[in-house]
Curated annotation (Swiss-Prot):
Origin species: Serratia proteamaculans (strain 568)
Protein name: NADH-quinone oxidoreductase subunit N
Molecular-function annotations in GO: NADH dehydrogenase (ubiquinone) activity; NADH:ubiquinone reductase (non-electrogenic) activity; quinone binding
Localisation: Cell inner membrane
Membrane topology: Multi-pass membrane protein
C-alpha cells in the first residue's frame, strides 16, 4: 500500500516518539550522559505533543487497517504523552543519586509511551495486543529499576509473572472471538457480534477471557492483587507512569472496543461487568482505609477510580454522555495523580534507599514545606471528589451519566465509594498539618518549586483548581474528541 503525506502527518506522534527511541539509543551508545539523554527524551516527547496540532489539521482517517487516527485517539495520545513527560521530569532528580546506569530509564519510558500511543489509535485486535505488550514489557524493567533493593525486585517479578498470565488470557480470548467471527478489526468484530452472535458459547468465552486479561491491566477486582505491592515496590516516578499513562491508554482502547462490540447488550456480560465495577469501588476504598503507606493507598484508590470509570464503560453503547464522562474523569485523574505522585517523587531520593512513602514521612510537612503540602492537599481533595476541584467534575459526570442511564445500583456504589474515600484522603491531608516529629529527615530541596518536577506539580495543582472552578475548556475539548465511525 502507498502511504500519502496526509497519512504520514496522522502518524507524526508515533513516528516522532519512535525516532526519539532510536536517537536516545544512539546517544547512550555514543556517550553515557544523564543530562543529554534526559534532554533528548523531553525534547522528543514535547515535539510529539506539538505534532498533535498538525494531526488535527489533517482530519480523521484510517491510516492502516490497524490504526484509526481521530479526535478520540488524539485526546488520549495527548494524555499519555503528558504523563510520560511528567514521569521523565520526576525521574531526573531521582536518578541523579542512582549508582548504576541511568540512561536506560528514559529509553524504557519512551518505548512504553510508544505502546500507549499505539493503544490510543488501535482499531484492530492485533494493534490492541501489540500496544498492550509494548506498554507492559518496558514496565517490567522500570518497576525493578532500583534492583539493588528488595522491594522493587519483588514488585517486578510479581508484575511480570501475573502480566504474562493476563496476556495469555487476552490472546486466547481474541483467538476464540476470531474463530467465531472471522474478523480481527474492531468494526468487523462489532458487525459480526451484532448479528445475534452474542449468545454463542464461543463468543461469550472469548469476551470473558478478554475481560480477565484487560481487567488485570486495569487492576479491577478480582484481578487487582498485584496493584498495591507493585505501586509500593516501584520507584515513585514509575508508580506515576503506572497509575496514569498505562491505565489511560488501556482504558481508551477498551472503550473503543466496547463502542463497536455490543458486549454490554448481553445480560450475562453486563451483570459480570456491573459486579466487577461494584466490587472494585468497594474493595479499593475499604482496603485503602487501613493503609499507612501513601503509594499503597494510592494503589488501592486507583482500583476504586477504575471501578467508577467502568460505569461509563457499561453504558457506552446506549449513552452518548459516557464518552464525555470517561474523557473528563481521566483528565481529572491524570492531573490529580501526577500531583500526588509528584510530591512523593520530590520527597524521595535513592540516596537513602526506599522512597518517602510512609504516611509518617508527611506528618507536619506543612510546617516545613507549606506550598508542597498545599499541593498535596489539593490533590487529595480532588481524588476525593470535593467541589471546586477537577475530581469533583469527573465524579459529577459519572453520577449524572449513571442516573440518566438508569444504572441505579452502580450510581449508589459510586456515591458510597466516594463517601468512604473521603475518610482516607482526609487522613492524609490532616497528617500534613499535625505537629512534625523532631527526628524526621527530609530529602526535599528548599528550592523544589524551581526544579522541573516542582513546576510540573504546581501546574498540575493549578489545572486541578482552575478546571474545577471553570471546566468548560476541558468539556469542549472532550466533546471535540469523538471517535470516527
Amino acid at each position: 500500500m502507498t502511504i500519502t503525506p496526509q497519512q504520514l502527518i496522522a502518524l507524526l506522534p508515533l513516528l516522532i516518539v519512535g525516532l526519539t527511541v532510536v536517537v536516545v539509543m544512539l546517544g547512550i551508545a555514543w556517550r553515557r550522559d544523564h543530562f543529554i539523554n534526559a534532554t533528548l527524551t523531553v525534547i522528543g516527547l514535547n515535539l510529539a505533543l506539538l505534532s498533535l496540532y498538525f494531526v488535527g489539521q489533517a482530519g480523521p482517517m484510517d491510516v492502516t487497517p490497524l490504526l484509526r487516527v481521530d479526535g478520540y485517539s488524539m485526546f488520549y495520545t495527548g494524555l499519555v504523552i503528558l504523563a510520560s513527560l511528567a514521569t521523565c521530569t520526576f525521574a531526573y532528580p531521582w536518578l541523579v543519586g542512582y549508582p548504576d546506569n541511568r540512561e536506560e530509564f528514559y529509553l524504557l519510558v519512551l518505548i512504553a509511551t510508544l505502546g500507549g500511543i499505539l493503544l490510543a489509535s488501535a482499531n484492530h485486535l492485533a494493534s490492541l495486543f501489540l500496544g498492550i505488550e509494548l506498554i507492559s514489557l518496558p514496565l517490567f524493567g522500570l518497576v525493578g529499576y532500583a534492583y539493588r533493593q528488595k522491594r522493587p525486585l519483588e514488585a517486578a517479578i510479581k508484575y511480570m509473572l501475573l502480566s504474562a498470565a493476563a496476556s495469555s488470557f487476552l490472546l486466547f480470548g481474541m483467538a476464540l472471538l476470531y474463530a467465531e467471527s472471522g474478523d480481527l478489526s474492531l468494526a468487523g468484530l462489532g458487525k459480526s457480534l451484532q448479528e445475534n452472535m452474542m449468545h454463542q458459547p464461543l463468543v461469550l468465552a472469548g469476551m470473558g477471557m478478554m475481560i480477565v486479561g484487560l481487567g488485570f491491566k486495569l487492576s479491577l477486582v478480582p484481578f487487582q492483587l498485584w496493584t498495591p505491592d507493585v505501586y509500593q515496590g516501584a520507584p515513585a516516578p514509575v508508580s506515576t507512569f503506572l497509575a496514569t499513562a498505562s491505565k489511560i491508554a488501556i482504558f481508551a482502547v477498551v472503550m473503543r472496543l466496547f463502542l463497536y462490540a455490543p458486549a454490554a447488550d448481553n445480560e450475562a456480560l453486563r451483570m459480570v461487568l456491573s459486579i466487577i465495577a461494584v466490587c472494585s469501588i468497594l474493595f479499593g476504598n475499604l482496603m485503602a482505609i487501613s493503609q499507612t503507606n501513601i503509594k499503597r493507598l494510592l494503589g488501592y484508590s486507583s482500583i476504586a477510580h477504575l471501578g467508577y470509570l467502568l460505569v461509563a464503560l457499561i453504558a457506552v453503547q446506549t449513552h452518548q454522555l459516557s464518552l464525555e464522562t470517561a474523557g473528563v474523569y481521566l483528565a481529572g485523574y491524570l492531573f490529580s495523580s501526577l500531583g500526588a505522585f509528584g510530591v512523593v517523587s520530590l520527597m524521595s531520593s535513592p540516596y537513602r534507599g526506599p522512597d518517602a512513602d510512609s504516611l509518617f514521612s508527611y506528618r507536619g510537612l506543612f510546617w516545613h514545606k507549606p506550598i508542597l503540602s498545599a499541593v498535596m492537599t489539593v490533590m487529595m481533595l480532588s481524588l476525593a471528589g470535593i467541589p471546586m476541584t477537577l475530581g469533583f467534575i469527573g465524579k459529577f459526570f459519572v453520577i449524572a451519566m449513571g442516573v440518566s442511564a438508569h444504572l441505579w445500583w452502580l450510581t449508589g456504589a459510586v456515591v458510597l465509594g466516594s463517601a468512604i474515600g473521603l475518610y482516607y484522603y482526609l487522613r492524609v491531608t490532616v497528617s500534613l498539618f499535625l505537629s512534625a516529629p523532631e527526628a524526621l529527615q527530609r530529602d526535599t530541596p528548599n528550592n523544589w518549586a524551581l526544579t522541573a518536577g516542582g513546576v510540573v506539580v504546581l501546574i498540575s495543582a493549578a489545572l486541578v483548581l482552575l478546571l474545577g472552578v471553570y471546566p468548560q475548556p476541558l468539556i469542549t475539548l472532550v466533546q471535540m474528541a469523538q471517535p470516527m465511525f
